[in-house]
Swiss-Prot record:
Claim: Chloroplast is one of the keywords in the record: yes
Name under which the protein is recorded: Protein EARLY STARVATION 1, chloroplastic
UniProt KW keywords: Chloroplast, Plastid, Transit peptide
Family recorded in the similarity comment: Belongs to the ESV1 family.
Cellular component GO terms held in the UniProt record: chloroplast stroma; starch grain
Region described as Disordered: 65-126, 403-431
GO terms of molecular function: starch binding
Primary localization: plastid
Length: 431
């Protein structure tokens, strides 16, 4: 919706699940460990409705009902593919949102603020500073008004101060239609203190007359680790959208963490629902900056009738030696379970031990000559995130008086890791 002299105009709401349960796109490789054979990637796993009738013959699986390909015994082909989309079937869901231009807001005594009311898009990861276009004022503002059609708007900003040099510059804006059925809110902020902590963030939410609602939060942080004394940058994003006309919606949580010595952690939790079907996905990457890498993915889906299916894999490598393993599984409404497990051991000498079995009796165990390949470094690391965080780095803290030093609490524990519980649908901030 856009607020202007003629009022708020609500745009249609889209809950397209084209990105439902997608794998992360393969990234350009910078440096990798090669040993002496052919490249291997993560295994392909898909499931179809036909697979429910004969799961023991399933090697590739889809949700779109395509005919599954039978698996060759004793041999495994490895590749990385995306879990297929689960589109919302309603006509509204087929309409695509156009990217809105980001235009100036928060001009004191200017026209009514305009909203980036477009719901967040699925599987777009963490936006950049430039995409958010945060522009805070140097003066306090508190304004409100009513448009010709009876819709209202408000805009305010401030500068809060606290102990230890804490400073928070912020801006809030929003509006709603005359009957309150359409509403939007947006908040920006930047924080800093004498410890070197800096934070840049934004949050927006909205709803329309059809009952659809959405919410998005973005944040990036710079701080110095108390124990390692290394600078760290962390970025995160949370997004959700709900349909007001059907039992449909989705939620995503993304995070990235970097330090100045190459330690990197990335991950995401995703959840979606379309009437009688729900799906989840979790994945993570960890690089210790000294050559060790861990990657994993776990995704699954289920229907209200009791059918469940999923796929997961994991790989660990260091200095050319490591392993890969995974499982594909399916449970029928009657409780019958089928699964196939597989694994690879890479010895770093050109030999790879491959093994696996399924609940239908197939099995394999052999050693082959193959090259070991894996990404030893993240495709996007410390140097990249520093280059893309110019606004965060330019935040100016309150000047510290001579002889006054920041208070650092070494007893404070580090932030808890993300929960392993499946992400659900948190309530909308507008409810």
């Amino acid at each position: 919706m856009a607020a202007c002299s003629r009022g708020l105009v609500a745009r249609p709401f889209d809950l397209t699940a084209r990105g439902a349960a997608h794998w992360p796109c393969p990234a350009p490789r910078r440096r990798a460990i090669r040993c002496c054979c052919r490249a291997q990637q993560e295994p392909r796993r898909r499931l179809s409705k036909a697979a429910a009738a004969a799961p023991e013959r399933t090697e590739e699986w889809r949700i779109d009902g395509n005919k599954p390909a039978a698996a060759a015994r004793g041999r495994r082909r490895a590749s990385l593919t995306a879990m297929p989309s689960l589109p919302f079937p309603s006509p509204r869901s087929r309409r695509q949102w156009k990217q809105q231009n980001f235009y100036p807001r928060c001009t004191p005594r200017g026209p009514a603020p305009q909203s980036r009311d477009t719901p967040p898009k699925r599987d777009t990861g963490i936006a950049s500073e430039k995409e958010w276009g945060i522009n805070l004022l140097d003066e306090a503002v508190k304004e409100s008004g009513t448009n010709e059609d009876g819709s209202t708007w408000y805009r305010e900003s401030g500068d809060d101060r606290g102990d230890n040099g804490y400073r928070c510059r912020w801006a809030r804006m929003g509006g709603q239609s005359h009957d309150g059925t359409t509403e939007w809110k947006e908040t920006w902020w930047e924080k800093s203190d004498w410890t070197g902590y800096k934070e840049l963030g934004a949050e927006k939410s909205g709803k329309n007359g059809e009952g659809d609602s959405w919410w998005e939060k973005w944040k990036e942080v710079l701080y110095q680790d108390e124990w390692s004394n290394l600078a760290r940058i962390e970025r995160s994003a949370e997004k959700q959208a709900k349909s007001g006309a059907e039992n449909a919606g989705w939620y995503e949580k993304w995070w990235e963490k970097y330090d100045a010595k190459g330690w990197t952690e990335k991950g995401a939790h995703k959840y979606g629902r379309l009437n009688e079907q729900s799906w989840w996905e979790r994945w993570g990457e960890h690089y210790d900056g000294r050559g060790f890498v861990l990657k994993w993915t776990d995704k699954w889906a289920e229907t209200d009738l009791g059918t469940k299916w999923g796929d997961k894999w994991e790989e660990k490598f260091f200095a050319g030696i490591g392993s890969r393993q995974g499982e594909t599984w399916h449970v029928s409404p009657g409780g019958d379970r089928w699964s196939r497990t597989w694994g690879e051991e890479h010895f770093g000498n050109g030999k790879v031990h491959k093994y696996g079995k399924s609940t239908t009796g197939e099995s394999w165990d052999l050693v082959v000559d193959e090259e070991t390949y894996y990404e030893a470094e993240p495709h996007y690391g410390w140097a990249d995130v520093v280059g893309d965080s110019t606004q965060l780095l330019s935040i100016q803290p309150v000047e510290r008086p001579p002889g006054v030093y920041p208070t650092i609490d070494f007893s404070a524990s580090s932030p808890a890791p993300p929960s392993d519980d499946p992400p659900g649908m948190p309530p909308s901030p507008l409810e």
